[in-house]
Amino acid sequence: MNGTEGPNFYVPFSNKTGVVRSPFEEPQYYLAEPWQFSCLAAYMFMLIVLGFPINFLTLYVTIQHKKLRTPLNYILLNLAIADLFMVFGGFTTTLYTSLHGYFVFGPTGCDLEGFFATLGGEIALWSLVVLAIERYIVVCKPMSNFRFGENHAIMGVAFTWVMALACAAPPLVGWSRYIPEGMQCSCGIDYYTLKPEVNNESFVIYMFVVHFTIPMVVIFFCYGQLVFTVKEAAAQQQESATTQKAEKEVTRMVIIMVIAFLICWLPYAGVAFYIFTHQGSNFGPILMTLPAFFAKTSAVYNPVIYIMLNKQFRTCMLTTLCCGKIPLGDDEASATASKTETSQVAPA
């Protein structure tokens, strides 16, 4: 083994020289220079400064404008709530621990930080699954008389939380565990050891199959069918121009969210899978730190994509920020929004 395993941690550094200390008790400056820990803290501060206002604004604008309370937007709001959980439950903790160079909150704090980070990421993933299924039903129409309504959206939101909790909660009750990872300032699932006492191997396999592979298969199936249907409908002109435009814009927004999710989370998942399948291999703390911290940007990019690509929401947001006045040049966006609002598709 090229790392050092303790009762509730695994440090990716050999203790042959006797320098390894518990990441819950002393700074880990033998893993990286102090300035590198400061860079992590600065990065987390940036995510907090960006993540809180933009997600809070998403919630506030939707509450202020009744026309935004559509079934599809329920799922998008669910993402904003999950992102706020990550900001308050995870980012603030990681900022503080990075400034100190070790996880000062102890094993219990590690459990909480790891739980919120995992919960937020899984809610985002399962929300994308629900959005993909919604797009598939609306555009491909496998059930001709089905209309995605408020009750379906609420069930979709509940489903995302149930599945996310099914992934994030087991390590809190003895199936696997949360431990500090990388430079030991943030916590995640234990991919580093088999730890038979907590059946770690079976949980990691369960997580990769049920909470990563299956969602990805569903998402790619839905969008594969969707792309084919959109091309076929465009060729046959089966829908009105307004409806086609609305469906394409909403679909484009959701596809971009999926791509952004993959860009942020695939490096983390790939490195975690490599470490798990190569137990005892030599890897440095930076190898897991960079993808783990990069994955946290998911709390920022979803609302940014939503605001940039959803004309109706953008107009409502600017109206809220400008104290009820529609800014000059947004009349066209407002008109477009009012047209697409009546479509079977959610506003875009």
Curated annotation (Swiss-Prot):
Task: Give the matching CDD domains.
Answer: 7tmA_MWS_opsin
Q: How is it modified after translation?
A: Phosphorylated on some or all of the serine and threonine residues present in the C-terminal region. Contains one covalently linked retinal chromophore. Upon light absorption, the covalently bound 11-cis-retinal is converted to all-trans-retinal. After hydrolysis of the Schiff base and release of the covalently bound all-trans-retinal, active rhodopsin is regenerated by binding of a fresh molecule of 11-cis-retinal.
Q: Where is the stretch described as Interaction with SAG?
A: 330-348
Q: Which residues carry this modification: N-acetylmethionine?
A: 1
Q: Which residues lie on this side of the membrane: Cytoplasmic?
A: 62-73, 134-152, 225-252, 309-348
Q: Which residues are glycosylated?
A: 2, 15
Q: What stretches pass through the bilayer?
A: 37-61, 74-96, 111-133, 153-173, 203-224, 253-274, 287-308
Which residues does this entry assign to the site Plays an important role in the conformation switch to the active conformation?
113
N6-(retinylidene)lysine PTM positions read 296
Modification type Phosphothreonine: residues:
336, 340, 342
User: Cystine bridges: which residues?
Assistant: 110-187
Q: Does the keyword Iron apply?
A: no
Per the Swiss-Prot or TrEMBL annotation, the motif 'Ionic lock' involved in activated form stabilization is positioned at 134-136
Does NAD show up as a keyword for this record? no
* Topology in membrane: Multi-pass membrane protein
Biological process annotations from GO: absorption of visible light; G protein-coupled opsin signaling pathway; G protein-coupled receptor signaling pathway; visual perception
What is the purpose of this protein? Photoreceptor required for image-forming vision at low light intensity. Required for photoreceptor cell viability after birth. Light-induced isomerization of 11-cis to all-trans retinal triggers a conformational change that activates signaling via G-proteins. Subsequent receptor phosphorylation mediates displacement of the bound G-protein alpha subunit by the arrestin SAG and terminates signaling.
Protein family per UniProt: Belongs to the G-protein coupled receptor 1 family. Opsin subfamily.
Return the protein name: Rhodopsin
Species this chain originates from = Caluromys philander (Bare-tailed woolly opossum)
